[in-house]
Swiss-Prot record:
An MF annotation (GO) of this entry: ATP hydrolysis activity
Encoding gene (name): ruvB
Organism: Rhodococcus opacus (strain B4)
Protein known as: Holliday junction branch migration complex subunit RuvB
The keyword DNA-binding is annotated on this UniProt entry: yes
Ranges for region Large ATPase domain (RuvB-L): 1-191
Amino acid sequence: MSPELGGGYDGESPVSADLVAGDGDIEASLRPKNLHDFIGQPRVREQLQLVLTGAKMRGGTPDHILLSGPPGLGKTSMAMIIAAELGSSLRLTSGPALERAGDLAAMLSNLVEGDVLFIDEIHRIARPAEEMLYLAMEDFRVDVVVGKGPGATSIPLEVAPFTLVGATTRSGALTGPLRDRFGFTAHMDFYEPAELKQILMRSAGILGVQLGEEAGAEIASRSRGTPRIANRLLRRVRDYAEVRADGVVTREIAHAALAVYDVDQLGLDRLDRSVLSALVRSFGGGPVGVSTLAVAVGEEPATVEEVCEPFLVRAGMIARTPRGRVATAAAWTQLGLTPPPDAVTGGIDVRVNEPQASLFDPEDP
């Protein structure tokens, strides 16, 4: 659990898009190996195919590539595919690991021509390393400062031509100079249920899980549009099927297993439902501040804001307003309650089916 989350949240929710213990090795076995095997993101795949094919035809390295989007959508898998399509070696690191310029210089000095350098969470790279990266991306060289004070000297070092692939969940947190140095930027969107079902059927084949078509659709519909969540739910359903049934995952088995893990039809878990229930039942639908809402569910504000809210907002159940969080009609309905007729969003009355006056109404004076 991240220290900033605190509270009672253990970070092990089956519908968390972040990596949790046990995901790493299994995710590696499920990753697609080339663009043809990658399911979903058709626009990104087409654009990347053009970028990579063009570079190979010219015999050079492609432009630096930035992959942005929420966690769990396949940015790391796409970076590995880029290296495989180019026939190059992949060097992996992360923004938080590059605390000093020397850390980056050591990594860059070990690159050979054509290598792909993947920096995950690139928005968290330290400022000194980021400034060194500017020169490396543009001119394939770095200036290493030796010594301190007036006697310090700068030694230029050549860097083999490489392709940087950066991944970020917060593209807005990137500085302008860094963002401008990427020649191609791809935003990865959430997946459709049909795409997630395809991913699940492929993963089931790799893991040796007997997964029925209807069961695949059932799991996909609760996966929040995220392949990482879909694959994690598949493993939990597999456990249930092997322990309490004959190992075959049917729709009924999937439904029963997901009920055990507190994942409902929309992919909401216990904490999500607690937040909705508190917002509607304790505060009449809001508006209410996130700190007050967090106290009501016994969690830290950061947990509510970073773990629960993104999906609840995307699902249209919570609206963020200047006055606080407001429950939408969908939230009331999800809890089996009737929305109030005078629904209010952020202090503004929602007017439904009101005819708009004509500018050319002959009865107007």
